[in-house]
Amino acid sequence: MSEKPREIKTRFPVARIKKLMQSDDDIGKVAQATPTAVAKALELFMISLIEETCNQARMRNSKRVSPSHLKQAVLETEQFDFLQDIVSKHPDAVAPATGEEEQPKRRGRKPAQE
């Protein structure tokens, strides 16, 4: 009996990852399993990053996840040290006088004028 290789489901487009990899002149041929492995690794990385970001939002009793939560997750988690120089370039969304997070601007209909 010969078994067919099981197809691995990923949430990121394998064909696009392969195309990105091949666009680099330093990379020659790409094995068939490589983009799939990269897609799965990217998926696991994103799950970890999002979970840490959500934890930051929960610790601050926030109902919404904001960029400041992502920044704090990167700064406080050793696993994401390689992202620290990227997030440090972005300002915090914290009001300096009160230390509270800025409220997002409300979108929607304007109140009726009398």
Curated annotation (Swiss-Prot):
It is found in: Nucleus. Its main location: nucleus. Residues 91-114 are annotated as: Disordered. Transmembrane segments: none annotated. One of its GO terms (biological process) is DNA replication. The keyword Aminoacyl-tRNA synthetase does not apply. One of its GO terms (molecular function) is protein heterodimerization activity. The keyword Nucleus applies. InterPro entries: CBFA_NFYB_domain, Histone-fold, Transcr_DNA_Rep_Reg. Disulfide bonds: none annotated. Keywords: DNA replication, Nucleus. One of its GO terms (cellular component) is nucleus. As accessory component of the DNA polymerase epsilon (DNA polymerase II) participates in chromosomal DNA replication. In eukaryotes there are five DNA polymerases: alpha, beta, gamma, delta, and epsilon which are responsible for different reactions of DNA synthesis. Heterotetramer. Consists of four subunits: POL2, DPB2, DPB3 and DPB4. PANTHER family: DR1-ASSOCIATED COREPRESSOR, HISTONE-LIKE TRANSCRIPTION FACTOR CCAAT-RELATED. This is DNA polymerase epsilon subunit C. It comes from Yarrowia lipolytica (strain CLIB 122 / E 150) (Yeast).
